């Protein structure tokens, strides 16, 4: 670009050539006709000269003798004095151009000629304070005090019934008011003096009022009485009453009082003897042992007990118990008998009379060592709360035991979004089961134990086989044993395998060994051989099998049925997944291939009504992402891009303006009338979906003809159903005749047209 000369810069009037301006070219000192212009000199006492002070900073010397030229002050001078015309608003010169007396003496002309910013500023304290409202406030205050004193005097006059005194006080106060109007400074002392004088005139006896007539009692018959019945509040019990109290392995039957908050224990004591809950059971067992062994036993041993003063148990069959005790010695010695008989429990004494549920009352007697009732948790499936969830939704196939938490290898569509197995932590599983499925938290440990027990079976201890104990059938060895070993050998003899059980065992082993080779025989397997694709897919069968036609048709029908079943299952699975994805909040699953502009608006409307803060759209092309961002702007939302390349998507977030502002639907409707369909760029569409969205050209069928072929050679003859043939037959035409009148008929054979595709010409034929 060419450089411009200096005479083009600035305003045209200042740098123009040959103009009438003072700085223009030649003859700038001349006017229009070239004559010189004479300038008038400015006087020294001009009001516009800033070096001459304007009355030493004051406007009072307008008519002074030493400056007779200032008889008139122009408005521009006043403006220059107060505001300054040629100076900047915040300059130091403007700081000095302020009204006020800057010097005490106006005779110092040398100081007066100094610049305003160099003159010192002095502050003078005023001798008197000009406050016109102060006097007005004092007058109003005095008037208020006068009115208050008048009201006090009038009240005292009504009580003591002294009208003469009241009038004198009022007159005195009125006189004081007149004096206050003359002299405001003496108002308050005079008023205080009048009030003090009035108070001194009142006697002490008149200050009290004595009621000589007693107050009459009211008539109580006129007062209505209402009887309100007190409703007894029911006693609230924080726990449920259980008629059976479990302490360790002992169960006690308890009963609840009606009015008291105590629970009594029913102890069936008879004759002040110790009660044992298993006394009846033990007596029945011992009685059965006595009846079965009384015929064969010859040895009778007595029981040596340490305490023979009182029996250990008390029951209805006490005689049978004693009789059973005498026969126990046939099987065990005295030391074993002492271990067999249970000692009386120190916990079940007569001192257990009442149990308190308030937590304040303690047990009476020596019952401090009572164990608390064991609260055994029910297994999963024994409560109604367990049926809130469906255990088929969560399929657990493996578990990893950890020090703190476990990991589970499970499959759950609602949790993971697919039908594959994944490893998840125990915290994630518990949150999903409690929050999503609604299982109570107190049943969560039972559910986890149920999963663990279903995967890890309990190992039960094996039953003893006594294989290490020698067993002999001889009677000599049996006589040498003592009573206790004799009984043990007799019990072990029952476990010996009888000979009749072993019958046929050899035949079974021989049969198993005979068919052992066929049982473990392996067959070669391979996939079926097919030909064709899609619906034309057929089973390829080897001819060496020599199968008949009926068998081949059966195999083909079964194979086609198998393919159709697989296709139906696949289609049903895809339809189910699509139906689940349509109700999902994840737009990547909801729109697998693309979305319409109406879908975008519906998603924005749904997002506006939900409590979510973020909404992620599927990856679209750049124009689609730009359209989504424009719609988000019209909905008063914030939009941003995430991802790279084909995975660039738009994330929309709510802001404060979204809640308080309404969307601009007019601009949104304009965007909806533009591009309708937006396809995803991160997923390739299948052929079926691609054919549905793209327009395909209809291909017409092409007819191929051969060289020399007669056109319409194989065309059928026109039948009698044709209306044209019927008209000709009515006119006298017959099949094989030409058209026309007699003597002027046309040809009977039609002219044949042959197809010619090559460029060799007509080629005259010799025939």
UniProtKB/Swiss-Prot annotation:
Residues 594-656 form the R3H domain. Disulfide bonds: none annotated. The modification Phosphoserine is found at residues 105, 217, 255, 334, 343, 345. Residues 720-767 form the G-patch domain. Keywords: Cytoplasm, mRNA processing, mRNA splicing, Nucleus, Phosphoprotein. GO terms for molecular function: enzyme activator activity; nucleic acid binding. InterPro entries: G_patch_dom, R3H_dom_sf, R3H_G-patch, Splicing_assoc_domain. Residues 1-17 have a biased composition (Basic residues). SUPFAM superfamilies: R3H domain. GO terms for cellular component: 90S preribosome; cytoplasm; nucleolus; nucleus; preribosome, large subunit precursor; preribosome, small subunit precursor. It is found in: Cytoplasm; Nucleus. PROSITE patterns: G_PATCH. Residues 42-52 have a biased composition (Polar residues). Gene3D superfamilies: R3H-like domain. GO terms for biological process: maturation of SSU-rRNA; mRNA splicing, via spliceosome; rRNA processing. Residues 176-185, 474-492 have a biased composition (Acidic residues). Residues 1-60, 176-200, 466-493 are annotated as: Disordered. May be involved in splicing since overexpression antagonizes the suppression of splicing defects by SPP382 mutants. Present with 1440 molecules/cell in log phase SD medium. Belongs to the SQS1 family. This is Protein SQS1. It comes from Saccharomyces cerevisiae (strain ATCC 204508 / S288c). The lineage of its organism: Eukaryota, Fungi, Dikarya, Ascomycota, Saccharomycotina.
């Amino acid at each position: 670009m060419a450089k411009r000369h200096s005479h083009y810069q600035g305003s045209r009037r200042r740098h123009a050539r040959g103009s009438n301006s003072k700085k223009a070219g030649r003859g700038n000192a001349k006017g229009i006709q070239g004559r010189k212009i004479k300038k008038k000199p400015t006087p020294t006492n001009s009001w516009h000269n800033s070096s001459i002070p304007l009355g030493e900073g004051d406007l009072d010397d307008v008519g002074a003798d030493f400056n007779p030229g200032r008889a008139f002050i122009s408005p521009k001078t006043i403006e220059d004095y107060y505001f300054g015309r040629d100076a900047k608003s915040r300059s130091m010169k403007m700081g000095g151009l302020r009204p006020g007396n800057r010097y005490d003496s106006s005779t110092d002309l040398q100081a007066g000629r100094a610049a305003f910013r160099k003159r010192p500023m002095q502050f003078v304290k005023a001798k008197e304070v000009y406050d016109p409202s102060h006097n007005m406030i004092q007058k109003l205050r005095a008037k208020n005090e006068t009115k208050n004193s008048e009201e006090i005097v009038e009240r005292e006059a009504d009580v003591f019934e002294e009208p003469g005194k009241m009038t004198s006080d009022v007159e005195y106060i009125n006189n004081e008011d007149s004096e206050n109007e003359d002299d405001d400074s003496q108002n308050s002392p005079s008023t205080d003096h009048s009030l003090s004088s009035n108070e001194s005139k009142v006697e002490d006896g008149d200050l009290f009022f004595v009621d000589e007539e007693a107050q009459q009692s009211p008539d109580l018959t006129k007062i209505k009485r209402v009887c309100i019945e007190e409703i007894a509040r029911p006693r609230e019990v924080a726990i449920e009453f259980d008629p059976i109290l479990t302490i360790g392995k002992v169960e006690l039957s308890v009963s609840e009082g009606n009015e008291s908050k105590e629970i009594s224990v029913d102890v069936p004591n008879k004759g002040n003897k110790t009660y044992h809950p298993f006394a009846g059971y033990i007596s029945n067992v011992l009685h059965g042992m006595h009846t079965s062994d009384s015929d064969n036993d010859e040895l009778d041993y007595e029981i040596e007990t340490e305490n023979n003063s009182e029996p250990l148990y008390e029951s209805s069959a006490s005689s049978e118990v004693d009789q059973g005790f005498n026969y126990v010695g046939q099987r065990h010695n005295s030391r074993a008998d002492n271990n067999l008989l249970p000692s009386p429990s120190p916990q079940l004494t007569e001192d257990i009379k009442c149990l308190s549920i308030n937590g304040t009352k303690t047990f009476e007697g020596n019952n401090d060592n009572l164990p608390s009732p064991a609260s055994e948790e029910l297994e999963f499936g024994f409560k109604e709360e367990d049926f809130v969830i469906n255990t088929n939704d969560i399929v657990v196939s493996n578990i990893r035991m950890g020090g703190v938490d476990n990991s589970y290898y499970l499959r759950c569509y609602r949790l993971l979004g697919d039908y594959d197995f994944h490893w998840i932590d125990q915290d994630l599983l518990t949150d999903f089961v409690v929050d999503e499925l609604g299982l109570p938290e107190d049943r969560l440990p039972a559910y986890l134990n149920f999963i663990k027990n279903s995967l890890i079976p309990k190992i039960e201890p094996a039953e003893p086989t006594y294989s290490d104990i020698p067993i002999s059938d001889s009677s000599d060895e049996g006589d040498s044993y003592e009573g206790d070993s004799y009984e043990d050998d007799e019990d072990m003899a029952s476990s010996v395998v009888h000979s009749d059980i072993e019958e046929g065992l050899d035949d079974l082993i021989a049969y198993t060994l005979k068919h052992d080779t066929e049982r473990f025989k392996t067959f070669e397997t391979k996939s079926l051989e097919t030909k064709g694709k899609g619906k034309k897919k057929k089973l390829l069968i080897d001819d060496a099998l020599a199968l008949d036609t009926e068998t081949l048709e059966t195999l083909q029908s079964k194979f086609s049925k198998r393919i159709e079943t697989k296709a139906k299952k696949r289609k049903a699975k895809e339809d189910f997944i699509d139906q689940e994805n349509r109700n999902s909040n994840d737009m990547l699953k909801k729109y697998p291939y693309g979305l319409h502009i109406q879908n975008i608006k519906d998603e924005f409307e749904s997002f506006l009504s939900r409590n979510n803060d973020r909404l992620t759209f599927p990856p679209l092309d750049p124009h689609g992402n730009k359209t989504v961002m424009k719609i988000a702007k019209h909905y008063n939302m914030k939009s941003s891009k995430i991802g790279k390349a084909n995975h660039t998507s738009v994330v929309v977030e709510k802001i404060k303006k979204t809640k308080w502002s309404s969307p601009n639907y007019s601009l949104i409707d304009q965007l909806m009338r533009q591009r309708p369909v937006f396809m995803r760029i991160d997923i390739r569409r299948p052929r079926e979906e691609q054919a549905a969205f793209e327009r395909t050209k209809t291909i017409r069928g092409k007819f191929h003809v051969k060289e020399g072929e007669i056109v319409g050679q194989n065309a059928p003859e026109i039948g009698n159903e044709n209306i044209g043939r019927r008209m000709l037959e009515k006119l006298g035409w017959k099949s094989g005749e030409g058209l026309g009148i007699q003597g002027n008929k046309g040809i009977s054979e039609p002219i044949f047209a042959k197809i010619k595709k090559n460029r060799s010409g007509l080629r005259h034929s010799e025939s």
